């Protein structure tokens, strides 16, 4: 399996092995090759034959003399610097195999846990320890679309670490370092994916603006486009919806937009109802209703929704998540929509992997938002309490060829 892993990594077309790894353990240079090392075999042909262990090329004199120089040059990335960076993170321990340099058979399909992957627990444990000490985000994928070069970078931390308050400062340091690196490289936009834009973690990205007031790279949390994606999933003619789960920036702007459109927003928890009511303009209070019923046919589901709440839903109810992560599938007689996402245009290049649980050629609305922000050359940030505008973001995405994704399934 090690040989297979190294083979996949060697053909991923970009350099991801950090230099400090060889500085800490110099003999590793002879035991493990890098993508840039193997790329010379395809360009120079009679050098760097090794598929995973350069030791034999050194022994038999087939090592390319420019290997170290090529490695350094690839790390610096002088040839192609990204215009847009999407910053995501690892989810569970098996998710590292779902990246492009993991197993292509897994990365090309929507992520689902595989029971047989547990036989690789020694390698999984080693990868967890490596990511724990790894001090920077790494590049997992590069793409092209129109005039833009995009990169997906991964913060080497898992969900359980994001949920730990003791890890908060370290994670913020990693994210801020990635933002400043993107700024140094001339990136126009950096979009924050998954938990990298948490309210408790960094105030939806606002923390980094406070620390770096002269930041030129625009921070995008993607709220506007994600809200638009959720609203597009609500069936036409819907007069009322039930809002459940934790309150958030997404919950507020969803409620605000729905109330402005004359749709009744129902809530069942009084404390959350009172808090949201304080945030909404007084003229919209009549559209926000405290209900003692779960009878609404459309539920907008946030983080924190319980199994007991789902069990109170009537048969055939639509659960539409407005969160980064899909809800637990509790009901087999109800319809579960996908998290906010869009289908990418056919001209989007080099998209060979699935983004987490999304199908091939489908991208989360938060990631699309960063790309659209750069294409439109919008000057403002979308983080903290600021939004680009729901209609503005939606129409811009459609104009650039992104299409609504209406993925749904029975529980």
What are the functions of these language-model segments?
Residues 116-219, 224, 228, 282, ...:
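Metallocofactor- and cofactor-centric catalytic cores in central/energy metabolism, strongly enriched
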Residues 1-124:
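Cytosolic/stromal cytosol-facing helical appendages immediately following the last transmembrane segment
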Residues 291-325, 335-337:
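Short, well-ordered secondary-structure micro-motifs within conserved domains or adaptor modules
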Residues 235-302:
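Glycine-rich phosphate/diphosphate-binding loop of Rossmann-like nucleotide-binding domains
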Residues 197-203, 272-278, 307-309, 327-330:
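Short, charged/polar "capping" segments at the starts of alpha-helices
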Residues 146, 318-411:
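Adenosine-phosphate binding glycine-rich loop
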Residues 224-240:
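A short, basic/flexible loop-to-alpha-helix module at the beginning of a structural domain
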């Amino acid at each position: 399996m090690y040989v297979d892993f190294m083979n996949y990594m060697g053909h991923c077309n970009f350099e991801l092995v950090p230099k400090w790894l060889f500085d800490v353990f110099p003999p590793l240079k002879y035991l493990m090759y890098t993508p840039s090392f193997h790329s010379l075999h395809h360009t120079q042909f009679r050098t760097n034959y090794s598929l995973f262990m350069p030791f034999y090329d050194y022994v038999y004199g087939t090592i390319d003399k420019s290997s170290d120089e090529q490695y350094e040059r690839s790390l610096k990335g002088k040839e192609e610097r990204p215009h847009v960076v999407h910053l995501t993170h690892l989810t569970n321990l098996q998710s590292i195999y779902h990246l492009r340099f993991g197993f292509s058979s897994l990365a090309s399909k929507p992520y689902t846990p595989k029971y047989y992957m547990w036989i690789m627990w020694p390698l999984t444990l080693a990868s967890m320890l490596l990511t724990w000490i790894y001090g920077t985000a790494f590049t997992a994928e590069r793409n092209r679309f129109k005039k833009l070069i995009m990169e997906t970078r991964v913060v080497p931390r898992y969900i359980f670490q994001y949920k730990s308050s003791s890890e908060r400062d370290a994670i913020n340091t990693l994210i801020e370092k990635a933002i400043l690196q993107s700024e140094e490289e001339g990136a126009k936009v950096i979009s924050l994916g998954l938990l990298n834009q948490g309210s408790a973690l960094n105030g939806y990205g606002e923390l980094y603006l406070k620390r770096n007031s002269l930041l030129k790279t625009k921070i995008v949390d993607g709220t506007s486009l994600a809200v638009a994606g959720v609203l597009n999933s609500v069936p036409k003619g819907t007069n009322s919806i039930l809002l459940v789960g934790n309150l958030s920036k997404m919950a507020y702007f969803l409620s605000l937009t729905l109330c402005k459109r004359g749709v009744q927003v129902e809530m069942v928890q009084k404390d959350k109802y009172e808090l949201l009511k304080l945030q909404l303009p007084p003229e919209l209070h009549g559209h926000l209703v405290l209900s003692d019923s779960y009878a609404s046919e459309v539920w907008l589901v946030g983080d924190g929704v319980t199994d007991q709440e789902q069990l109170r839903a009537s048969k055939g109810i639509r659960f539409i998540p407005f969160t980064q992560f899909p809800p637990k599938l509790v009901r087999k007689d109800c319809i579960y929509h996908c998290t906010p996402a869009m289908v990418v245009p056919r001209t989007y290049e080099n998209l060979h992997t699935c983004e987490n649980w999304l199908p091939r050629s489908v991208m989360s609305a938060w990631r699309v938002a960063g790309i659209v922000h750069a294409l439109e050359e919008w000057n403002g940030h979308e983080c903290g309490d600021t939004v680009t505008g729901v209609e503005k973001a939606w129409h811009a995405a459609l104009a650039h060829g992104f299409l609504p994704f209406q993925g749904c399934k029975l529980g």
